[in-house]
């Protein structure tokens, strides 16, 4: 077991009850272009087209064999584009249950599949996009091979679902998915301390337990300790629900679009786990579930998710949470004179620091305006990786990609710096800054 000592479990109220309930049905689903870094789409459909579940919506110009398929059957109702015609989302109004069939295999034959058979089925079904590389967090090139594949079956994000609850319902499919992935590369199954999961004893699968505060459950943490990456070495990672989907695909020949997500946050009337579907419309999902007021829906974690609004009002491809916060749009009178009983800080600046175990109703307010970066040891307190966070963040801010690489930037994704953004007195958002640097590194070296 690997024990993480540095980090932070955000003391936010509204944690979900770890029991799965059916969510209200949604009328539309979507694929979000923002989820796929560096992807340039070649559209295969247009508005008004009727599509089947699993039908190709678009492919990647850089990797034409990588297909992005429909998460539901129905009619393409909108293709949203932003500045410079960047793809924002492809929306499907659900209608019917027509679906494409893909290759299926007996469960006892999965261990004999060739890597080519596995790749072909994942590519044709669109489930290849469940995989992401590290470095760069992109959908992998089908011609590439990873050093290893990391399955994240632990979740320490604030307000997250317990993976063990979800996997318990789909144990056979999860084990089948692990078997299939093992045909591509060795698999690290990362789990919580004291948890037993299906497939741990499979040949080619190495189970590793992690404990401690967040980010003990992030793939970046697991990769750093078990199989570190660099400029000449890459690994792939995916979450536990995509492993289940892969197992379902290979044993049934059909796409499994179910998603169990945490509907939680301080403004949620009944925080719980809900059963919905990939790419679900979050406005519809949250309707009638929140306290009255001006609230924000976040696809993903409160630390590293994105605002779900307009063209982006859908569940992200890699997200397993719908987090809901009150908009922090009201300024407090003489806030600097208050004791801060209802505010949280990593530093000893509020009275709340003395109230151990207290949960806070966080809002979207940053509690301050942007200012200079101040190195007071707060980054080191939440960074468990063997890197120098203050120095790395400074080089990322000024865009010195050479020094950023030397200090470990290639090991990181936006979510790995989310806690640094949270504890930053200067109110920097390090995730987008890291992404800009990674894009430059990939283009220029």
Curated annotation (Swiss-Prot):
<keyword id="KW-0520">NAD</keyword>
<keyword id="KW-1278">Translocase</keyword>
<dbReference type="GO" id="GO:0006814">
    <property type="term" value="P:sodium ion transport"/>
</dbReference>
<keyword id="KW-0915">Sodium</keyword>
<dbReference type="InterPro" id="IPR056147">
    <property type="entry name" value="NQRA_N"/>
</dbReference>
<comment type="subunit">
    <text>Composed of six subunits; NqrA, NqrB, NqrC, NqrD, NqrE and NqrF.</text>
</comment>
<dbReference type="InterPro" id="IPR022615">
    <property type="entry name" value="NqrA_C_domain"/>
</dbReference>
<dbReference type="Pfam" id="PF24836">
    <property type="entry name" value="NQRA_2nd"/>
</dbReference>
<comment type="function">
    <text>NQR complex catalyzes the reduction of ubiquinone-1 to ubiquinol by two successive reactions, coupled with the transport of Na(+) ions from the cytoplasm to the periplasm. NqrA to NqrE are probably involved in the second step, the conversion of ubisemiquinone to ubiquinol.</text>
</comment>
<keyword id="KW-0739">Sodium transport</keyword>
<dbReference type="InterPro" id="IPR008703">
    <property type="entry name" value="NqrA"/>
</dbReference>
<keyword id="KW-0813">Transport</keyword>
<dbReference type="Pfam" id="PF05896">
    <property type="entry name" value="NQRA_N"/>
</dbReference>
<keyword id="KW-0406">Ion transport</keyword>
<dbReference type="Pfam" id="PF11973">
    <property type="entry name" value="NQRA_SLBB"/>
</dbReference>
<protein>
    <recommendedName>
        <fullName>Na(+)-translocating NADH-quinone reductase subunit A</fullName>
        <ecNumber>7.2.1.1</ecNumber>
    </recommendedName>
</protein>
<dbReference type="GO" id="GO:0016655">
    <property type="term" value="F:oxidoreductase activity, acting on NAD(P)H, quinone or similar compound as acceptor"/>
</dbReference>
<keyword id="KW-0830">Ubiquinone</keyword>
<comment type="similarity">
    <text>Belongs to the NqrA family.</text>
</comment>
<dbReference type="InterPro" id="IPR056148">
    <property type="entry name" value="NQRA_2nd"/>
</dbReference>
